């Protein structure tokens, strides 16, 4: 059974993100780029002013391109998307707050992250992690190389 305030709780994340200036920063990761695609480090500001990192890979050629968005797993390390995907699609792999490359000032503990702050809705870590995921979606919606269809 869904709690009465369930929808309000999750809609609150979207409302909170409206007041965040994401200040995107892209920097090519030349060691990861190949003739078929360019890989960037993407930094964005998410909820509570937290800077998050994502791998952002764009195929070479004329776009726009469809996107494969690799949502973060329950672990400390996020890997760059597979080579074959990067050749044909824009690929994004988010490192949410606490994961490696997004671990300053907070480093997530495994196990333990799943229930961190669960006793109060505004301190539950997965509320902020959901915001991190939505921040990347907002970034993608504003990119010319992304096929939004």
Predicted regions: what they are:
Residues 131-148:
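Conserved acidic catalytic loop of the alpha/beta-hydrolase fold
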Residues 17, 75-79:
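Hydrophobic/aromatic-rich structural module bridging two neighboring secondary-structure elements via a short loop
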Residues 54-59, 63-74:
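Short beta-strand element of the alpha/beta-hydrolase
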Residues 79, 83-84, 89-131:
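Cap/lid segment of the alpha/beta-hydrolase catalytic domain
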Residues 46, 70-74, 96:
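Glycine-rich His-Gly loop
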Residues 1-37:
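N-terminal targeting or regulatory segments adjacent to alpha/beta-hydrolase or S9 domains
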Residues 38-60:
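A short loop-to-beta-strand scaffold at the N-terminal edge of the catalytic core in hydrolase folds
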């Amino acid at each position: 059974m869904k709690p009465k305030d369930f929808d309000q709780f999750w809609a609150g994340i979207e409302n909170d993100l409206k007041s965040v200036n994401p200040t995107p920063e892209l920097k090519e990761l030349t060691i990861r780029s190949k003739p078929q695609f360019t890989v960037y480090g993407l930094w964005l500001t998410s909820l509570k002013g937290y800077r998050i990192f994502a791998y952002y890979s764009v195929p070479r050629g004329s776009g726009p391109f469809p996107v494969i968005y690799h949502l973060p797993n329950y672990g400390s390390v996020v890997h760059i998307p597979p080579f074959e995907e990067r050749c044909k699609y824009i690929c994004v792999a988010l490192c949410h707050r606490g994961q490696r490359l997004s671990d300053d000032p907070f480093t997530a503990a495994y196990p333990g992250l799943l229930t961190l702050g669960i006793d109060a809705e505004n301190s539950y870590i997965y509320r902020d992690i959901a915001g991190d995921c939505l921040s990347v979606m907002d970034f993608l919606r504003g990119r010319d190389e992304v096929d939004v269809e």
